[in-house]
């Protein structure tokens, strides 16, 4: 299978459905093999995100995708999980208020994302509150 890097078409097709339900699209991965199209979507909602809601979303999104795409579609929807690696600056905004493990130099430090900004975020530990630039983050994951 070949991984496809531009997922903007998929994002544009599903963003209205997720936005109305207060759900953030964290990640979209697409793979194509001949006439088969495999799509993996990671979604996040801060509260009341049940398995039933995921099942309903799967049905709605799959119908939209099958109506537009010219391939057989295999769809996998999941949530980020409790130890998700934060992969983009955009995710700091999505996970505001959440506890994370952050590596700046060679040590991990635990704290909370208080507020995400354009170039960084406010990180609060037990002893300090500091602005961290996204460019200084080596690793970050939910904790």
Curated annotation (Swiss-Prot):
Which cysteine pairs are joined by S-S bonds? none
Name the UniProt key words of this record, in alphabetical order.
Answer: Cytoplasm, Ribosome biogenesis
Q: A GO term (biological process) for this protein?
A: translation
Cellular compartments annotated: Cytoplasm
Matches recorded under InterPro entries: Ribosome_maturation_RimP, RimP_C_sf, RimP_N, RimP_N_sf
Listed GO cellular component terms? cytosol
Entry's family note:
Belongs to the RimP family.
Q: What role does it play?
A: Required for maturation of 30S ribosomal subunits.
Name this protein carries in UniProt: Ribosome maturation factor RimP
């Amino acid at each position: 299978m070949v991984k496809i890097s531009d997922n903007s078409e998929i994002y544009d097709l599903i963003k209205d459905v997720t936005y109305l339900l207060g759900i953030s699209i964290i990640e979209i991965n697409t793979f194509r093999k001949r006439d088969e199209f495999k799509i993996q979507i990671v979604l996040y909602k801060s509260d009341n995100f049940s398995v039933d809601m995921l099942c309903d979303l799967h049905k709605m999104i799959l119908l939209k995708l099958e109506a537009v795409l010219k391939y057989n579609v295999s769809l996998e929807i999941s949530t980020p999980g409790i130890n998700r690696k934060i992969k983009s600056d955009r995710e700091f905004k999505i996970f505001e208020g959440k506890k994370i493990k952050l590596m700046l130099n060679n040590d991990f430090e635990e704290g909370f994302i208080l507020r995400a900004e354009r170039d960084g975020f406010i990180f609060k530990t037990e002893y300090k509150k500091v602005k961290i630039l996204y460019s200084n983050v080596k690793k970050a994951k939910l904790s």
